[in-house]
Amino acid sequence: MSQAAMTPAEFEQALRAKGALYHIHHPFHRAMYEGRATREQIQGWVANRFYYQVNIPLKDAAILANCPDRETRREWIQRILDHDGAPGEEGGIEAWLRLAESVGLDREQVLSQELVLPGVRFAVDAYVNFARRASWQEAASSSLTELFAPTIHQSRLDAWPQHYPWIDAAGYDYFRNRLSQARRDVEHGLRITLEHYRTRDAQEHMLNILQFKLDVLWSMLDAMSMAYELERPPYHTVTAERVWHKGIDL
């Protein structure tokens, strides 16, 4: 016999409890906000995280493509504009490129994605492919790692200027902007989730989807830890060159 469905309050509490597994607790991220990261590690994180940033609009476009509800689309499309920009607004991708320049990276090199590690690419691609194949409600719900995002952005704003004075302060605009954007996005995503998942089986399914998204974020940092902390990038026993694939256009 299946368990009774969680009440909306209980379900939201279960969702928020997943914050214990958010990547703010990953050793690589802890090193960054505790001031123990090297310049190379900060640069590696920014360059690799750029691949995530440029794919977020693709993920959101997939949700829109699968969603027949006009009101939902009208609200969700703001996420694409937040990242891609709009007339008179640079958008999050451009803000991230300014962060890259602020930590000493070359803009064109970041845009080329040549620094993106295979493990990061695989994790991000898995997320985008999930959004394309899942129902729009499932893909929308996977965004609820944003429940925990304001805390991680604030930790960077609080710690990085103190620990890394060599970073140009102009690069922090992305984190500042996401403080309010993430809270707005959470409100919408949470509303969709609490309304859609009404049975216990459906709620457990959604919690597993959220765990998948947490796995994506954690796996990205695992790949960066291997490359920049343990100094074991792909093929390190064979060559010091970046020989891994740079993405395949199909």
Curated annotation (Swiss-Prot):
Keywords: Oxidoreductase, PQQ biosynthesis. It catalyses: 6-(2-amino-2-carboxyethyl)-7,8-dioxo-1,2,3,4,7,8-hexahydroquinoline-2,4-dicarboxylate + 3 O2 = pyrroloquinoline quinone + 2 H2O2 + 2 H2O + H(+). GO terms for molecular function: pyrroloquinoline-quinone synthase activity. Its EC number is 1.3.3.11. GO terms for biological process: pyrroloquinoline quinone biosynthetic process; sulfur compound metabolic process. Pathway: Cofactor biosynthesis; pyrroloquinoline quinone biosynthesis. The keyword Oxidoreductase applies. SUPFAM superfamilies: Heme oxygenase-like. NCBIfam families: PQQ_syn_pqqC. Ring cyclization and eight-electron oxidation of 3a-(2-amino-2-carboxyethyl)-4,5-dioxo-4,5,6,7,8,9-hexahydroquinoline-7,9-dicarboxylic-acid to PQQ. Belongs to the PqqC family. This is Pyrroloquinoline-quinone synthase. It comes from Ectopseudomonas mendocina (strain ymp) (Pseudomonas mendocina).
